[in-house]
């Protein structure tokens, strides 16, 4: 086991991507993947899996602040199930509440409005999701 994890912040137009190491508990953003109505370019995802060979995939689970599911929750679950079905890799869903808010805030602090590019926000959210997963001791 390499200890490498790949995280996705699922969205209908853009899917944020981050790579991280279990041993350090840190993650960094990778370029976001464009999606069309929630459907990604599966060849890009396959390339990411071949390049990074993660032990596990983390997919952010969008929930309302009270923990209930929202319309995007089922689509994120479906995305996670498809990754597992297509590539046979372990996929874990992880609560992503407030990850986008935190990502926007961090990017804005570092670069103002110009830094709030959609793909950058989505991949920064994926970093936050993965680091949150590590912080919970997984």
Swiss-Prot record:
Keywords noted in UniProt: Cytoplasm, Hydrolase, Nuclease, Ribosome biogenesis
Role this protein plays: Could be a nuclease involved in processing of the 5'-end of pre-16S rRNA.
NCBIfam families: RNAse_H_YqgF
InterPro entries assigned: RNaseH-like_sf, YqgF, YqgF/RNaseH-like_dom, YqgF/RNaseH-like_dom_sf
Gene3D superfamilies with a match to the protein in the record: YqgF/RNase H-like domain (3.30.420.140)
One Gene Ontology MF term: nuclease activity
Similarity field: Belongs to the YqgF nuclease family.
Matches recorded under CDD domains: YqgF (cd16964)
Organism: Salmonella typhimurium (strain LT2 / SGSC1412 / ATCC 700720)
Gene Ontology annotations of biological process type: rRNA 5'-end processing
Name of the encoding gene: yqgF
Official protein name in the record: Putative pre-16S rRNA nuclease
A family per Pfam: RuvX
Paired cysteines (S-S): none
UniProt enzyme class: hydrolase
SMART domains xref list: YqgFc (SM00732)
GO cellular component, one term: cytoplasm
Entry superkingdom: Bacteria
Subcellular location: Cytoplasm
């Amino acid at each position: 086991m390499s200890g490498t994890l790949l995280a996705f912040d699922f969205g209908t137009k853009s899917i944020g991507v981050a790579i991280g190491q279990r041993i350090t508990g840190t993650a960094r953003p990778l370029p976001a993947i464009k999606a069309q109505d929630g459907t990604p370019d599966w060849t890009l995802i396959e390339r990411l899996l071949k390049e990074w060979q993660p032990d596990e995939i983390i997919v952010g689970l969008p929930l309302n602040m009270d923990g209930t599911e929202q319309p995007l929750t089922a689509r994120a679950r479906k995305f996670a199930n498809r990754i597992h079905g297509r590539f046979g890799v372990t996929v874990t869903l992880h609560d992503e509440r407030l990850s986008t808010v935190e990502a926007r805030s961090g990017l804005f602090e570092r670069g103002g409005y110009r830094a709030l590019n959609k793909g950058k926000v989505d991949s920064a959210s994926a970093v936050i999701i993965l680091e949150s997963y590590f912080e919970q001791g997984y």
